[in-house]
Amino acid sequence: MVSFDRPVWAEIDLSAFRHNMRQIKSLLQPGTIFCPIIKADGYGHGAVPLAHEAVAMGAGYLGVAILDEAAALRAAGITLPILILGYTPPQAAAFVVSNHITQTIFSKEQADALSAAASNLGITVKVHVKVDTGMTRIGVRPEEAAAFCSYVAGLENVHLEGMFTHFASSDSADHAYCLEQFGRFTAAIAAVEASGIRLGIRHCANSAAILSLPEGHLDMVRAGIILYGLKPSDECPMPIDLRPVMRLKARLAMVKQVPPGVGVSYGSIYHTQKESSLATIPIGYADGYTRMLSRKAQVLLRGQRAPVVGRICMDQCMVDVSHVPQAAVGDEVLLFGGPDLPADEIAAHLGTINYEVVCMVGKRVPRVYVE
């Protein structure tokens, strides 16, 4: 199959990624395991290239959400321990075991399936028990943790390596609920260890907690959004310097002069008010530049902002460049990324978070890795 370079790309700055990793590690005590979270294709940045960078930078674990993500890393030659943070059906246990993947568990059915598969293969499988301290998602209740861990520890060919929880509001200025969750988790740890079980890796700190709850770092931290240079929230303190890793870019496909009163794009919801210069950008909602940004977003062209006019199409959108007379076909356009047009601005237009903005960038947008 012949593939041609699109005049649309997501520029991924590897030096920024490494810088962010160094900055985050500066907050940790010696011996704390650093676990980059590269689920959802590395938050849209490309899991495999960034996994290789993370390994080279001294990561001790990698975190993903689903089995397919772990499998892709193994297929790419990543040998570092990988923790699947989410649910994996018991029928996939043999694949988990044979690929030396660490699985999150919270039910006897999962644990039994992993034990059976590991016994059949003559391999010991590592597991981490998830404790639901207040996210109300997957996980055993804190008061169930000791009994469940005792059950798991008694299974053949299963190594109970760790236990963890996830904070629901560590990115909030009010840490009351986060501290309540942390208290429940530490109580669960104490109950488990009082039963004679030694938990090698206890972890609960996500990006926001890494920044604002040092007592929650424990044995391992899970760095997600901050690894990509984005803030967990506006309320979250930022004691380190982060650099955005992704910039979404394109090149102008056409520039045309349009008289007053002309409708633009589907539905003609926008009409030119005067003689205008309009440019077409070959990116649309199929690429993750969502239709919901129509008449809201701006792009950066030749150092100036240009508003999106009319509805964003599946593959193209239009901007008014009347105030940029030098605009020409082939000019580079920044759709988001960096300090001048941050992903947070796009998120604000959409009523969402920066996580979703970078994750929305579609598969047909090439990722171009730069230093």
Swiss-Prot record:
GO BP term, pick one: D-alanine biosynthetic process
Keyword Transport: no
Top enzyme category: isomerase
Pathway(s) where this gene product acts: Amino-acid biosynthesis; D-alanine biosynthesis; D-alanine from L-alanine: step 1/1
GO MF annotation: an example: alanine racemase activity
Modified positions (N6-(pyridoxal phosphate)lysine) in chain numbering: 39
Keywords: Isomerase, Pyridoxal phosphate
Function: Catalyzes the interconversion of L-alanine and D-alanine. May also act on other amino acids.
HAMAP family noted in UniProt: Ala_racemase
Name of this protein: Alanine racemase
Organism field: Desulfovibrio desulfuricans (strain ATCC 27774 / DSM 6949 / MB)
